[in-house]
């Protein structure tokens, strides 16, 4: 059983939830903490204590982060990154990555739906495009630089020319985590209006995380 007193310890990285989208009293970290504890139950005797220790020592990582990064971004990202770093030291990179990938994808998809108001607004192509632009202005992707390339009734394309999430992970020697965040986008966008709107990036390796200068985001109405 998960101790409810520690359910606030771990959140997915990076969190993409606008606070005004989240229901009062809803702590989305309650999604990822039980997942981590469950996944780690055979890797260590006391996974709950491991997470508490990470919570109490996360200041060590925060002091290492370049102050050029926004304080809000640091506050959001530091603990999940610190959990991952400690898992790598304890379990090795491969196991740590797979554990964090499940937590990030599960929590991230739930958070995406809150951020984009999926339960509050009708699911239409127009609303999806509007939400993407709005999230980039006021949501937790507001630190990225977005340019609209094309928008019509059947196609929407943007490019991200700067991703601070990737810059942060690279600065800490953890670039492998950025593609996991991209996987949240893949799952979320393609499940918003399945079989009606398809999301792609114009082909493989079209991301800043792949060494490109920009990330391509393309939505097309197909049904």
Where are these regions (language model features)?
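A helicase ATPase "motif cassette" and its flanking acidic/Ser/Thr-rich regulatory loops
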Residues: 158
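Short, electropositive alpha-helical surface patch
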Residues: 212-218
